[in-house]
């Protein structure tokens, strides 16, 4: 009997490795791992999938596409879920889903499988994205279906020849990509526990960071970071370099109790050294170049966009419309931000732009001042007129 094909989003971990053998009863499994900058041993992952029963194994480098089509939206949109989380994992899920659907179409597969549990956000992100791209594809979530304890899963793995990962005893659940690292579980589940140092990997403790700051100049063209200290770089490479540099100075640690889409609160530890640095720099160039009305309105868009992406609605028309609006604001966002990295902080200490709306001759309080202060008298009268009329009417009513 010819089996149907299933495309499995494969990580190389225990859950998705067990999923291959579990799915193999009814499907020919094609394992697919997307490299979004997590830094894993991709050759090992490729070979392991075949070893545990996949008929094909694909490892696809999508770092550049991830950076240019997804991370850049988060950067230009200053996306912080609940004003704190820079959308690390949430950003990669739509791209991974898109690639899974593409491979399903190429191979004739009718089903896609993922390794998410039934209590996380990622199951929603994957399945909503896949349904948005091809509603006819079936989606299977083995971990959600088998409902095993960890011990039962390990016993199944041993019985079916699935290698047990060396780091299985780690109490943490980690997800990582170019934009940062997310960590949960173990001692972190108690929000009263301070996160221990072994929960971090990309950053040193701020108090252990160098006692002297380092400065980095970041160049932007149309809202895109294009160079570090004058060195032109692809966006993915620039982010990775900043992850290393800012991480050495303890930048980008985030401890967040967040409201998950599925209705529970979770405590997460994020490390986003490159993201935090770039977000600070980009915001300062915007402050220099955007007109006041746009600078005041854009954060409203940013907050809504953050929620849409976090909640798995990347391919929703609302998200697409907001991204289009966002892109239209970036043509003037050109310039250089000088960022000071020191003891956990990324602080913009200087900025310049050929599109700068800052006019020193208008802002100065020296004799070079060109601001017409006499014009303020009439402006104040007109600006305050509605308030004055309201006060007069209220005073008349109170008599």
UniProtKB/Swiss-Prot annotation:
Top EC category: ligase
Keywords, ordered alphabetically: Amino-acid biosynthesis, Arginine biosynthesis, ATP-binding, Cytoplasm, Ligase, Nucleotide-binding
Residue positions binding ATP: 9-17, 115
Residues annotated to bind L-citrulline: 85, 121, 125, 173, 258, 270
Any one of the GO CC terms: cytoplasm
Pathway assignment: Amino-acid biosynthesis; L-arginine biosynthesis; L-arginine from L-ornithine and carbamoyl phosphate: step 2/3
GO function terms (MF aspect): argininosuccinate synthase activity; ATP binding
A Pfam family hit: Arginosuc_synth
Record note on quaternary structure: Homotetramer.
Family, similarity comment: Belongs to the argininosuccinate synthase family. Type 1 subfamily.
Name of the protein in question: Argininosuccinate synthase
Gene this protein is translated from: argG
């Amino acid at each position: 009997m010819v089996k149907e094909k299933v495309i499995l989003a494969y990580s190389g971990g225990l859950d998705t490795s067990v999923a291959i053998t579990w799915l193999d009863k009814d499907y020919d499994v094609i394992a697919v791992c997307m490299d979004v900058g997590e830094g894993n041993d991709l050759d090992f992952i490729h070979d392991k999938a075949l070893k545990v029963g996949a008929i094909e194994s694909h490892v696809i480098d999508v770092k550049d596409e991830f950076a240019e089509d997804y991370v850049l939206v988060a950067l230009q949109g200053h996306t912080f879920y609940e004003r704190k989380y820079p959308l690390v994992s949430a950003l990669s899920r739509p791209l991974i889903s898109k690639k899974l659907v593409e491979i399903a179409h190429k191979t004739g597969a009718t089903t896609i499988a993922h390794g998410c549990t039934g209590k996380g956000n990622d199951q929603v992100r994957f399945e909503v994205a896949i349904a948005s791209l091809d509603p006819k594809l079936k989606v299977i979530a083995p971990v959600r279906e088998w409902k095993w304890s960890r011990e039962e899963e390990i016993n199944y793995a041993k019985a079916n020849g699935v290698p047990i990962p060396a780091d299985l005893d780690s109490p943490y659940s980690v997800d990582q990509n170019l934009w940062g690292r997310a960590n949960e579980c173990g001692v972190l589940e108690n929000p009263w526990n301070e996160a221990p140092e072994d929960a971090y990997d990309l950053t040193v403790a701020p108090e252990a960071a160098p006692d002297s700051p380092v400065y980095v100049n970041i160049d932007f063209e149309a809202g895109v970071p294009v160079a570090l200290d004058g060195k032109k770089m692809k966006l993915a490479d620039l982010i990775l370099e900043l992850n290393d540099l800012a991480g050495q100075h303890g930048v980008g640690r985030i401890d967040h109790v967040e409201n998950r889409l599925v209705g529970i609160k979770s405590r997460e530890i994020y490390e986003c050294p490159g993201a935090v640095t770039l977000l600070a720099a980009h915001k300062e160039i915007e402050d220099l170049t955007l007109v006041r009305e746009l600078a005041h309105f854009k954060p409203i868009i940013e907050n809504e966009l953050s929620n849409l992406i976090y909640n798995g609605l990347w391919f929703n028309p609302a998200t697409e419309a907001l991204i289009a609006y966002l892109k239209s604001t970036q043509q003037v966002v050109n310039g250089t931000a000088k960022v000071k990295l020191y003891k956990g902080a990324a602080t913009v200490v200087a900025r310049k732009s050929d599109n700068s709306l800052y006019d020193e001759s208008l802002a100065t309080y020296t004799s070079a001042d060109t601001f017409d202060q006499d014009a303020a008298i009439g402006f104040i009268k007109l600006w305050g007129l509605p308030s004055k009329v309201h006060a007069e009417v209220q005073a008349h009513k109170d008599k």
